[in-house]
């Protein structure tokens, strides 16, 4: 796993062992090709950051700041180590339950990215829906984007068929078993 483009292009990202499922290079590359026009100077919140691969890619490509949040101590340690070794400026790592973090954060972001753990069985928590129903809306700038990675066809994979008050699904891209959902805040 590596940073694909920008100031830190080619940097090898250290990934923690265990249940972490980092966003694949090809999915990140496609995501950032879409975001490229709005990325320079953007303030980004990366929820369920894992090793920090999405946040690091954003900083490498010109984001002004990235706040990376994850509940797992090991993931946060790896994200901090990756941030330090990549020598990218403007990143911070917060160890916190992401749903609780959203309830208390006072920041404003241009882009919020969430890649929560995939549902493994029927009835598992739909963390993307929980985020969208909470105060995530308040953390975005007026022209901000919420981008979620979900698993195709299981658990939250059908989220695109649901409507959430205050949100408009503007794009959906599928890469293998991953779906990237792009939402805009409605005024």
PLM regions and their residue ranges:
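Class I S-adenosyl-L-methionine-dependent methyltransferase catalytic core
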Residues: 1-187
């Amino acid at each position: 796993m590596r940073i694909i483009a920008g100031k830190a292009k080619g940097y090898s990202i250290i990934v923690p062992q265990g249940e972490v499922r980092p966003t694949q290079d090809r999915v990140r590359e496609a995501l950032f090709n879409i975001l490229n026009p709005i990325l320079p100077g953007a303030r980004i919140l990366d929820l369920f950051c894992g090793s920090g691969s999405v946040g690091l890619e954003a900083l490498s490509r010109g984001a002004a700041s990235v706040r990376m949040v994850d509940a797992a101590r090991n993931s946060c340690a790896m994200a901090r180590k990756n941030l330090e070794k990549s020598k990218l400026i403007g990143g911070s790592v917060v160890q916190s339950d992401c749903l609780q973090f959203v309830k208390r954060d006072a920041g404003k972001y241009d882009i919020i990215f969430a890649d929560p753990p995939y549902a493994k069985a029927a009835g598992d928590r739909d963390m993307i829906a929980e985020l969208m129903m909470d105060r995530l809306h308040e953390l975005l700038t007026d022209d901000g984007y919420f981008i979620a990675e979900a698993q195709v066809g299981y658990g939250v994979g059908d989220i695109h068929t649901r409507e959430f008050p205050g949100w408009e699904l503007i794009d959906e891209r599928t890469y293998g078993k991953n779906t990237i959902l792009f939402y805009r805040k409605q005024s």
